[in-house]
C-alpha cells in the first residue's frame, strides 16, 4: 500500500517547523492515521518530540552523512505499516553547507520526489510573505511547494492581508495557521526545543498542539497534497557471528542520555544483540549479565545533581569497567565517564573513570558538520578514510 508523504520546510531556523510538525503528527494520530515521522539532519531533539507525538520511532535522513541510496532505503523501508509520512526539514528550505545549498532540505525533497509544505514566520510582516513564498517557489523549479502554513498570526486582519497577498501573487493555498501564542508550548533552550524527556508536561504540550492543528489546519487538504510512495521491505539482517546471538548490551537511556539514532540500535538488534535499557538516574546498579554498555549523548549537565546523587550506580559502573566491561560512550556519555562536571561554580562528581573535570560555558561555542581524513595507522579506521 502506498504511503502519502510530504516534507515540512521553513524559510529559516525558528520559522515554526517543529511546532507545525508535532501539531500535525499529533492531530493526524488522533484522527486514526498511522504516521511515520522523519527528521532531516542529525537532530535528536526534534526527532524525539516527533516520535512521541506520532507514537512510533522517528528516523533521521541526513544528506551530508548518508548517501542518496541510504536515504532512499531508510525512508522507504520505514514506511511499512503507515498511512502517512512527514519529514521535517531543518534551517531554511534552500540552506545547505555552502552557497549552492548542498545537502539542503530542498535537495532532500528533490531526491525523495516529495512536495513541500512551507512554514513562514509572519511576525511583523504582511505582503512581504507573498514575495518570500514566490521567491522560494521560483528559486528552483524542481522543488514542488504544495502549500503554506502561516506562523505567528497576531489577528484576523493580519491573517486576511497575508492570505489576500498570497492569492493575488501565487496559486499556493494556505493550508493552516499558527496563532501567536502568549507562552511557548515547548520549553526552549540554547539548542532550540528542550528534549521531551526533560519536560514533565510533554504529553500535555503535544495534546495542546493537536488541538491547535485541528482548529487551524486544513488536515484534509494537507493529506491530499501529499505524494504517494511505495514502501519497500527491509533486507533480512546478515549476522556477523553466531556469538552475537548471546550478546546483551546495556543502553543508558533516560533524561540525561537520550541522543540515539534508532538505526544504530536496530543495527545492533539486527546482528542478534539484546538491548537492555537502563536509567542511570534511578537504577541502583548495572544488570549483572551485560556483555557491553552503550552511553549516548545528551545533557548530563541538566541532570548533574541526580547523576551525582546516584552513588550506587556510579560505583557499579566503575566496578564493571574495572572488570573489563566494554563501553562505548560519546558526547554527554563520555562526559559522564569523567571525574566531575563544573557548573556555575559547583562541582558535581561523576563516574570517575577518567581523571578529567569538564566545565560548560553559558552559551554554545559552535556546532555543525565536520569532516576528517585518517592520517595514521590505528586500530579502528583505515588510513586515508574520510570521516564525517
Q: Can you name each region flagged by the protein language model?
A:
Residues 245-310, 315-320:
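Phosphate-binding active sites in nucleotide-utilizing proteins
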Residues 126-241:
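Internal gly/pro-rich beta-alpha loop/helix module
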Residues 2-112, 120-147, 156-160:
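ATP-dependent carboxylate-amine ligase catalytic core
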Residues 114, 172, 322-326:
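A short helix->loop->beta-strand "cap" motif at the edges of active sites that frequently abuts
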Residues 300-380:
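Cysteine-nucleophile active-site neighborhood
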Residues 5, 33-34, 246-248, 274, ...:
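Residues that mark the start of a beta-strand
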Residues 109, 215, 243-245, 257-269, ...:
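C-terminal and late-domain segments of enzyme folds
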Residues 39-40, 173-182, 274-282:
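Beta-strand->loop->alpha-helix junctions that form or flank phosphate-binding loops
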Amino acid at each position: 500500500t502506498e504511503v502519502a508523504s510530504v516534507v515540512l520546510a521553513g524559510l529559516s531556523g525558528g520559522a515554526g517547523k517543529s511546532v507545525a510538525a508535532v501539531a500535525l503528527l499529533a492531530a493526524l494520530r488522533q484522527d486514526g492515521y498511522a504516521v511515520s515521522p522523519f527528521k532531516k539532519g542529525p537532530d535528536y531533539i526534534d526527532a524525539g518530540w516527533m516520535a512521541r507525538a506520532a507514537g512510533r520511532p522517528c528516523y533521521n535522513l541526513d544528506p551530508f552523512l548518508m548517501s542518496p541510496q541510504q536515504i532512499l532505503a531508510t525512508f522507504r523501508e520505514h514506511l511499512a505499516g503507515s498511512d502517512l509520512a512527514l519529514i521535517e526539514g531543518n534551517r531554511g528550505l534552500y540552506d545547505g553547507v555552502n552557497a549552492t545549498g548542498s545537502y539542503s532540505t530542498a535537495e532532500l525533497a528533490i531526491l525523495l520526489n516529495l512536495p513541500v509544505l512551507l512554514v513562514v514566520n509572519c511576525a511583523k510582516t504582511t505582503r512581504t510573505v507573498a514575495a518570500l513564498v514566490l521567491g522560494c517557489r521560483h528559486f528552483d523549479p524542481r522543488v514542488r511547494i504544495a502549500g503554506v502554513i502561516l506562523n505567528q498570526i497576531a489577528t484576523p486582519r493580519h491573517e486576511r492581508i497575508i492570505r489576500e497577498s498570497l492569492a493575488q501573487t501565487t496559486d499556493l493555498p494556505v493550508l493552516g495557521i499558527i496563532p501567536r501564542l502568549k507562552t511557548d508550548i515547548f520549553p526552549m533552550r540554547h539548542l532550540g526545543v528542550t528534549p521531551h524527556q526533560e519536560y514533565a508536561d510533554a504529553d500535555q504540550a503535544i495534546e495542546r498542539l493537536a488541538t491547535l492543528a485541528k482548529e487551524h489546519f486544513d488536515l484534509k487538504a494537507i493529506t491530499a497534497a501529499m505524494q504517494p510512495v511505495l514502501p519497500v521491505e527491509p533486507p533480512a539482517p546478515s549476522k556477523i557471528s553466531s556469538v552475537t546471538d548471546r550478546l546483551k548490551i546495556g543502553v543508558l537511556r533516560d533524561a540525561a542520555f537520550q541522543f540515539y539514532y534508532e538505526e544504530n540500535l536496530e543495527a545492533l538488534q539486527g546482528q542478534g544483540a539484546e538491548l537492555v535499557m537502563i536509567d542511570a538516574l534511578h537504577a541502583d546498579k548495572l544488570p549483572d549479565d551485560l556483555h557491553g554498555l552503550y552511553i549516548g549523548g545528551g545533557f548530563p549537565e541538566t541532570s548533574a545533581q541526580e547523576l551525582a546523587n546516584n552513588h550506587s550506580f556510579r560505583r557499579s559502573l566503575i566496578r564493571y569497567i574495572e572488570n573489563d566491561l566494554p563501553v562505548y560512550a560519546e558526547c554527554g556519555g563520555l562526559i559522564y565517564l569523567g571525574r566531575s562536571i563544573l557548573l556555575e561554580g559547583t562541582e558535581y562528581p561523576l563516574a570517575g573513570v577518567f581523571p578529567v573535570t569538564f566545565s560548560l560555558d553559558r552559551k554554545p561555542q559552535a556546532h555543525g558538520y565536520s569532516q576528517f581524513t585518517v592520517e595514521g595507522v590505528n586500530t579502528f579506521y583505515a588510513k586515508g578514510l574520510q570521516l564525517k
